[in-house]
Amino acid sequence: LTTLPMALCFFLQCGSFRNDSEGIYVHDRMYQVPLRKDIWDAAKEVNARNGMVIAGTGGGKSAFTLNLTQQLIEQDYTVVVVEFGKSFSQLCRLYPDISLHVDYDEDGVGINPFDLQGEELDNGSIEMLSGVVQKYWRHMFTKDESEKEVALTRFIQDYYENVREGHNFESFYNHVTEHYPEILARKHIPKDFLLESFSLNCGEFLPGRRYENVCKDTGTDFSGKEFIVFELTQIKQDRFLSNLVMGMIFTVIQKKLLSDRRKRGVLIFDEYGETAQMVDTATGTGIHSSVAFCYQKI
C-alpha cells in the first residue's frame, strides 16, 4: 500500500498533443505525426523562450537544429549562429541573398564595430566601443581606474567629432596617436593617460601585425542579412583571439537581435560545450555569463 500522490507518479497516462496556431513543425513523440509548436510564444505564456538540444554523439542534434533553423528562416526570423564546425555552411548556400558565413581566415573577420551604419554615437555605442578597445588593449579597467575609462570614452567622442567617414579601428588608433596633445587639450584629459601601453598593445591589430585580420575591413555588410553564421573552429586554440572575436560577435548580436524588440530573433550556439570553456583573458570571467545575458534579453 502507498499514498495516492506516490501511486500517481507511476501512473502513465498521456493526452494527445495539440497544434499551435503558428510555429515550427516537429514530430509527435507518440505517433510521429507532424505537430506545430509555437516556440516564440508572443503571448509570453511561458516564462522563457530558451531551450537546449541534448543528445549523445550521433543522436541527431545538428540535424534537428538545421531543420529548426531552416523553418525559422522561412518564417522571417533573424537567426545568428555561433558554431565550431561547418554544419550551417550548406544552409547558407540555400539562402545566399540573406545569409552570411563568417570564417576567420586570411581575409579577416569583417566585423567593424566602429561603423555605426549612419546612427548617432550614443551612450550605448560609446560603452560598447570602450569595451572593444579595452579588449584590444588587454587592459579591462577596474572600478579603481574610472578616470582612465572616462578618458578613453572622451577619445572615442573626439574621434567621431573630428573624423566624419571611414570609421574603423585603424583610423581610431591613428587619430589617438597622431593627435594626442590636441585631444588632451580639447577634452581636458590628464596627461597621465597610458598612451605608450595603448599604442603598443593595440598596435598589434594594425596592418602587418599579428592580429591584423581581426580589424581588416572586408566590406562585409551585416545590415541586410537575416541569417548570420560565425565559424570559430580555426581560432579556438588561441584563447585571447577566440575571446576577442566572441566579444565582437556580441556586438553583432546586440545590433541584429537585441536592438529592436519588435523583431523575432533566435541565437544558436552549436556545440556549446566548446563555447562554455572559453574564459575572458582580460577579466578571468567565463564567456557563459555573456551568453546568458544575451539569452535573457531575447
Protein language model features and the residues they cover:
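P-loop NTPase motor domains
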Residues: 5-35, 84-296
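Pre-Walker A adenine-sensing motif
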Residues: 31-45
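Conserved lysine of the Walker
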Residues: 61
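Hydrophobic positions on the alpha1 helix immediately C-terminal to the Walker A/P-loop
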Residues: 64
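Walker A/P-loop NTP-binding motif
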Residues: 67-74
